[in-house]
Design a protein with these regions (language model features):
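Acidic helix-start/capping segments at beta-turn-to-alpha-helix junctions
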Residues: 44-64, 77-101
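Sec-exported extracytoplasmic/periplasmic mature domains
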Residues: 33, 37, 68-76, 83, ...
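Active-site-proximal alpha-helical segments within enzyme catalytic domains
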Residues: 63-66, 70, 136
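Sec-dependent N-terminal signal peptides
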Residues: 4-13
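...with weaker cross-activation on analogous glycine-rich loops/strands in unrelated enzymes
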Residues: 24-29, 87-168
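Active-site-adjacent structural segments surrounding the nucleophilic cysteine of cysteine proteases
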Residues: 18-61
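Low-complexity, Gly/Ser/Thr/Pro-rich intrinsically disordered linker/tail segments
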Residues: 164-194
Length: 194
């Protein structure tokens, strides 16, 4: 009897955790969608940022800033988290920029670094061509070609044909929601939550 009670308690607690996780990702998707602003100027220039919780000027940004700003709504500071992980594990991160130490002003704004962070600290998911493999709140990364990578967050809104969720991102036209899930080669698919 005692074993049955323990088993039921584990099921209840485990279910609560799973529900809380799903609820977080739904809230993340909604928060990300609230960032829509087509007037954001695409500006990849290097900026000296406050630390922690530093951000570029509010009317500017790139694709990574959409993700960073969405998580900040939950007091999750990717600038600090990425910087701390890179300080402890610098050699595990991409070495494309010729640096020999982390840079708290830019590291979290680079797609390859976010991919590595989400792989290390979150949940890497399969790169699938099935729309059902992607859920609101998931993070997706693409290879645009020519060495350019891109990142966005899946929102709840669906495509016109209701086949797939849309993405909030910034590829140069501001922070917008578009049907781009399968427009480019997917190179990363993650879930990251508290």
């Amino acid at each position: 009897m005692r074993s049955l009670i323990i088993f039921i308690a584990i099921l209840i607690c485990g279910g609560t955790y799973c529900y809380a996780q799903v609820d977080f990702y739904d809230q993340l998707a909604d928060s990300a969608a609230s960032l829509v602003n087509p007037n954001i100027i695409y500006d990849p220039s290097y900026s000296i940022l406050d630390y922690p919780n530093g951000d570029v000027v509010a009317d500017r940004g790139v694709c990574t800033d959409v993700v960073i700003r969405a998580y900040r709504m939950f007091d999750i500071d990717l600038q600090r988290l990425v910087h701390e992980d890179m300080k402890m594990n610098f050699d595990d991160y991409p070495q494309f920029w010729g640096l020999n130490h982390p840079d708290k002003n830019i590291d979290h704004r680079r797609v390859p670094n976010l991919m590595k962070f989400f792989e290390r600290q979150g949940q890497a998911k399969a790169h699938s061509l099935s729309p059902t493999a992607y859920s609101p709140g998931d993070i997706v990364c693409w290879d645009l070609g020519g060495g350019i990578m891109h990142i966005g967050i899946i929102v709840k809104k669906k495509s016109v044909d209701y086949q797939r969720h849309l993405i909030i991102h910034n590829i140069g036209g501001g922070q917008v929601i578009e049907d781009i899930l399968f427009e480019y080669k997917i190179i990363g698919h993650y879930a990251y939550g508290p």
